[in-house]
């Protein structure tokens, strides 16, 4: 009977831990470029919309990535 090969590669961090580390890095970068009051409002909106869920974490990551991308894109082109 065939068996799946055992995973011989290095252990990866769990997805959730990696996601939280990414969120922390994005937050640290965002506070360097945007007013804290804006970021606080964004966080409140996400919390009111998604509650304390992984969907909320994913949403805020996506929004922060987009904000930072647009910010840097405009900063470089001027």
Swiss-Prot record:
- Please cite one Gene Ontology biological process associated with this protein: symbiont-mediated activation of host apoptosis
GO CC field: host cell; host cell nucleus; host extracellular space; virion component
Recorded hits in Pfam families, A to Z, give:
VPR
| Location relative to the cell | Virion; Host nucleus; Host extracellular space
Q: InterPro entries attached here?
A: RetroV_VpR/X
- Domain of life of the organism in this record? Viruses
In terms of Gene3D superfamilies, this protein maps to: 6.10.210.10, VpR/VpX protein, C-terminal domain
Its keywords, alphabetically, are: Activator, AIDS, Apoptosis, Cell cycle, Host G2/M cell cycle arrest by virus, Host nucleus, Host-virus interaction, Ion channel, Ion transport, Modulation of host cell cycle by virus, Phosphoprotein, Transcription, Transcription regulation, Transport, Viral penetration into host nucleus, Virion, Virus entry into host cell
Region annotated Homooligomerization sits at: 1-42
User: Known post-translational modifications?
Assistant: Phosphorylated on several residues by host. These phosphorylations regulate VPR activity for the nuclear import of the HIV-1 pre-integration complex.
Kindly state the subunit structure of this protein: Homooligomer, may form homodimer. Interacts with p6-gag region of the Pr55 Gag precursor protein through a (Leu-X-X)4 motif near the C-terminus of the P6gag protein. Interacts with host UNG. May interact with host RAD23A/HHR23A. Interacts with host VPRBP/DCAF1, leading to hijack the CUL4A-RBX1-DDB1-DCAF1/VPRBP complex, mediating ubiquitination of host proteins such as TERT and ZGPAT and arrest of the cell cycle in G2 phase.
Job description of the protein: During virus replication, may deplete host UNG protein, and incude G2-M cell cycle arrest. Acts by targeting specific host proteins for degradation by the 26S proteasome, through association with the cellular CUL4A-DDB1 E3 ligase complex by direct interaction with host VPRPB/DCAF-1. Cell cycle arrest reportedly occurs within hours of infection and is not blocked by antiviral agents, suggesting that it is initiated by the VPR carried into the virion. Additionally, VPR induces apoptosis in a cell cycle dependent manner suggesting that these two effects are mechanistically linked. During virus entry, plays a role in the transport of the viral pre-integration (PIC) complex to the host nucleus. This function is crucial for viral infection of non-dividing macrophages. May act directly at the nuclear pore complex, by binding nucleoporins phenylalanine-glycine (FG)-repeat regions.
Q: What does the further note read? A: HIV-1 lineages are divided in three main groups, M (for Major), O (for Outlier), and N (for New, or Non-M, Non-O). The vast majority of strains found worldwide belong to the group M. Group O seems to be endemic to and largely confined to Cameroon and neighboring countries in West Central Africa, where these viruses represent a small minority of HIV-1 strains. The group N is represented by a limited number of isolates from Cameroonian persons. The group M is further subdivided in 9 clades or subtypes (A to D, F to H, J and K).
Assigned protein family: Belongs to the HIV-1 VPR protein family.
The protein's name is Protein Vpr
Source organism of this protein record? Human immunodeficiency virus type 1 group M subtype B (isolate BH10) (HIV-1)
What gene name is given for the protein in this entry? vpr
């Amino acid at each position: 009977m065939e068996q799946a090969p055992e995973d011989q590669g290095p252990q990866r961090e769990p997805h959730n831990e990696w996601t939280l580390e990414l969120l922390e890095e994005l937050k640290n970068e965002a506070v360097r470029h945007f007013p804290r009051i804006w970021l606080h409002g964004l966080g409140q909106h996400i919390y009111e919309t998604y509650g304390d869920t992984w969907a909320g974490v994913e949403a805020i990551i996506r929004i922060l990535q987009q904000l930072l991308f647009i910010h840097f894109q405009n900063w470089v082109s001027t």
